[in-house]
From Swiss-Prot:
Keywords: Cell inner membrane, Cell membrane, Membrane, Transmembrane, Transmembrane helix, Virulence. It comes from the Bacteria. The VirB system could be required for the establishment of the replication niche in the host. This is Type IV secretion system protein VirB6. It comes from Brucella suis biovar 1 (strain 1330). The gene is virB6. The chain crosses the membrane at residues 32-52, 61-81, 153-173, 177-197, 205-225, 245-265, 270-290. It is a multi-pass membrane protein. Belongs to the TrbL/VirB6 family. GO terms for cellular component: plasma membrane. Induction: Specifically induced within macrophages by phagosome acidification. Induced at 37 degrees Celsius in minimal medium, suggesting that nutritional stress is a regulating signal. InterPro entries: Conjugal_tfr_TrbL/VirB6 (IPR007688). Transcription of the operon is maximal in early exponential phase.
Length: 347
């Protein structure tokens, strides 16, 4: 019996190397951007606070405090390797395994053993090829035609099996490598969430990771289907039967093997399309949330600054804008206060 461990050995070796690579690159990226991020963030929020206090910038002070707290939380994820590994790297790997399990169905193979599944499919086909080769090799001179046919069929089955498992393993290994590279440089893109002009970088980085996860999950689903079909067709080949056409069974197996890689290629392509749409939806939802919050804040400001205070508000308005503002019915505006004080200091 042939029990190959080709893909399992390659996949496990690459997976271990990629895990070390992610940790090393993420740590180096954090060390590179930590000083710049702390200095830039500190200077930015210090300058914004000073400008707001002297009236050069209008806006509620609470918004600046909330923005500063949000930046510190983002920095805690982007500049600490243990937090990043636990909350980001492990989460992405769990998403990959979860999507692969869900898309593969009840009898699907988890993504952690997908390389073993490839080896099992490869071993089943090669076992049939080995039996065909042995049977053809044992033919005598009087059965040279049958022996030659079985030898040819053995090579046909072995090649078809490799064509089925090879591209799938290559695409999964390549996609996992892409995920590892994206996770390695992830701290830079997570830190980009701290400033509005650079938030789009995080959306595109997250979209690329989701695209890779969907591609692995969809490949797992197709692999589960193709492995079931392949195993059933291989089990139907009975070399000892005098009535079954071995040639027809092998040709059917070859036809299925040609169709399945094309299906995997199309599924891989559609995974990229779905991931791109999720990325675009993330950006749109982020913009929608910002616009909604801005509109809601403006509406609440109008409500609290326009009608609170009852009848006293009308008399305050009649007395002038300065007394109305002093009554506590409007938000604190340093620029407006400076303008009012300037009116009193005029000659």
């Amino acid at each position: 019996m042939v029990n190959p461990v080709i893909f399992e050995f390659i996949g496990t070796s690459i997976h271990n190397q990629l895990n070390n690579y992610v940790t090393m690159v993420a740590s180096n990226t954090m060390n590179m951007i930590a000083t710049t991020a702390v200095l830039a963030g500190g200077l930015y929020y210090t300058a914004m606070g000073i400008l707001m206090s002297v009236g050069r910038i209008e806006g509620p002070f609470s918004q600046l405090v909330i923005s500063c707290i949000k930046f510190m939380l983002i920095a805690a994820f982007a500049l600490n390797i243990s937090t990043y590994s636990e909350w980001v790297i492990d989460t992405v790997h769990n998403m990959e395994s979860g999507f692969a399990d869900a898309f593969a169905g009840n009898h699907g193979t988890p993504s952690s053993t997908i390389y073993q599944t490839l080896d099992n499919s490869l071993g089943k086909g090669w076992n049939i090829a080995a039996m065909l080769f042995e049977k053809g090799d044992n033919r005598g001179l009087t059965q040279i035609v049958q022996g030659f046919s079985e030898l040819l069929l053995s090579f046909l089955v072995a090649g078809s099996t490799l064509i089925l498992a090879g591209p799938t393993g290559a695409m999964i290994v390549a996609t996992n490598a892409v995920i590892a590279i994206l996770l390695g440089i992830g701290p830079l893109f997570i830190l980009a969430l701290g400033w509005a002009p650079t938030r789009g970088f995080f959306d595109r980085w997250f979209g690329a990771i989701v695209t890779s996860i969907l591609q692995v999950a969809l490949l797992s689903a197709v692999l589960s289907i193709s492995s079931a079909i392949f195993s059933r067709m291989v089990a139907a080949i009975n070399l000892a039967s005098a009535t079954q056409s071995t040639l027809f069974s092998c040709l059917s197996l070859t036809a299925v093997t040609i169709v399945m890689p094309y299906m995997m290629y199309k599924v891989y392509e559609y995974g990229g399309i779905l991931g791109s749409s999720i990325s675009a939806a993330t950006i749109s939802l982020g913009s929608l949330a910002v616009n909604t919050a801005t509109s809601g804040g403006g509406a609440m400001t109008s409500i609290f600054s326009g009608s609170s205070g009852g009848g006293g508000s009308g008399s305050a308005k009649a007395g002038g804008e300065s007394s109305y503002s002093a009554g506590g019915n409007a938000m604190w505006s340093p620029a407006y206060r400076q303008h009012v004080l300037g009116q009193f200091n005029r000659d």
